[in-house]
Amino acid sequence: MASNTPVCDFGWQAVDFELEDTHASRHTLASLRGPNGLLLMFICNHCPYVKAVIDRICRDARDLQALGIGVAAIMSNDPVEYPEDSMENMQRVAEQLAFSFPYLHDTTQAVARAYGAVCTPDFFGFNQQLQLQYRGRLDASGRLPAGPHVRRELFEAMREVAATGHGPR
């Protein structure tokens, strides 16, 4: 699995899908999109990087939702290969961390392949027309705790998308 996200393909059109969340509700791009865009995050329960940054992911998701950005997380791993990523464990994690966003299960990995997701977490930020405007990291701290001066790169980029429809280049 790659450890770095590829360069953003600005303007790439989001691929539609329909996936079930941890509450057995089904979601599509249209149902997830906020008035100012959409952030899709490929995450999983077992990844040490996700575990290290999940509190910051939750914070940024709440802050972006307040700006009219829809947010969803997608888990595409095979739970047979990674038992920690089972639906039951997805439900437990979403509840324990009080996810403010749907946590979707991509059982066939078709959505991950369609998006070219290569690592976890992998962030895809779209404008209101569902054109890709951000593909990058959460911040520069990686798995380390974020210090007080660490830029919130994902949040800042998506705030720009919410305000202008365009991400940073």
Tell me what each language-model feature is.
Residues 1-163, 167-169:
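Chalcogenol-based redox active-site neighborhoods
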